[in-house]
Regions:
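An N-cap/entry alpha-helix motif that binds or orients negatively charged groups
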Residues: 1-43
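Alpha/beta enzyme core
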Residues: 2-3, 7, 13, 51-155
């Protein structure tokens, strides 16, 4: 007979408040993603089609985080989503794939004043991803950060 393991979700757990001499308003949660890219809360929304389009990007930006517009859109649709977020004067990122055909997408979305471009791949520790990073570095404005991943190896 198989044993059923216990599992919990966020609704099952409560953090018990404790005495503190620090007020929440005195806490600084900001982080530097790069030397020039700072966010007020250390949260980025996932570049998934069920998670981040303009409404989530705007909400994340207004809260102090960063939304990454997913790449499962046409290039034109992705640009529209980026522009909607940028119109609210908040930070925004956008995802591209790791293939050479995605360089066309990268070239076009990099003209949209992105704060960060994300190379979205299941396995980022590959020669192909390294090569696409080099190509995007040559295309991007200096102020646009590059993020590549996912990487789960120790190297």
């Amino acid at each position: 007979m198989e044993t059923i393991k216990e599992a919990l979700t966020f609704d099952d757990v409560t953090l018990a408040p404790n005495y503190s001499e620090i007020l929440p308003s005195e806490v600084n949660t900001s982080i530097n993603l790069t030397e020039s890219l700072n966010i007020k809360i250390p949260l980025l929304s996932s570049a998934m089609d069920t998670v981040t389009e303009s409404s989530m990007g705007i909400a994340m930006g207004q809260a102090g985080g960063l939304g990454i517009i997913h790449r499962n859109l046409s290039i034109e649709e992705q640009i529209k989503e980026i522009r909607k977020v940028k119109s609210k004067k908040v930070l925004v990122g956008a995802a591209v794939g790791a293939s050479d055909k995605e360089l066309k997408r990268a070239q076009k979305i990099l003209k949209e004043n992105l704060d960060i471009i994300v190379i979205d791949t299941a396995h980022g520790h590959t020669k192909k991803v390294g090569n696409i990073i080099k190509k995007i570095k040559k295309l991007r404005p200096k102020k646009t950060a590059i993020c590549a991943g996912n990487i789960a190896t120790a190297e």
